[in-house]
A protein has these predicted regions:
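Catalytic-pocket segment enriched in acidic/His residues
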Residues: 18-142
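N-terminal accessory regions of nucleic-acid-interacting proteins
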Residues: 1-9
Length: 142
């Protein structure tokens, strides 16, 4: 039933503001800054995807693949995520659910790898598309 409620799939650049993310044990403070979550470039209709679990998601930093995994490797399936979220908040048409990121996060690398002004970040999902975002200095963000 949960899969029938999905209009489509898109890319989302799940940016983290690490210093705020460390204020608590939860990720929320570091995930909800204005103008930090790029989405798009378009919505691929769910009806045009035969098996979402076969899709591959990649994060590419300056041309180098940093993260890559198939959606069947998610800790929780998309129906499980929808079911869980709908257990504590109503979901309505237009809501976006972001599933998270594959292994390979820069903060967990040895040594850690942090994005800097001028970097180019790409989030690509096979059969869905590619979102390309530049990393800008926070003082010049419009």
């Amino acid at each position: 039933e949960a899969l029938q409620s999905i209009a489509g799939y898109t890319c989302y650049n799940d940016v983290s503001i690490r210093d705020y993310q460390r204020h608590t044990s939860q990720f929320v403070p570091g995930k909800n800054f204005s103008k930090t979550g790029g989405c798009g470039p378009f919505l691929k209709l769910a009806s045009s995807i035969n098996n979402y679990q076969s899709l591959t998601i990649k994060t590419i930093l300056n041309g180098e693949v940093m993260q890559e995994a198939k959606l069947d490797q998610l800790i929780f399936t998309i129906p499980e995520i929808i079911s869980y979220i709908s257990s504590f908040t109503p979901l309505v048409a237009g809501d976006i659910i972001v599933t998270g990121t594959p292994g390979g996060v820069g903060d967990r690398r040895d040594p850690p790898l942090y994005m800097k002004t001028g970097d180019i970040v790409e989030v690509e999902i096979s059969e869905v598309g590619k979102l390309v975002n530049p990393v800008l200095d926070e003082n010049i963000i419009l």
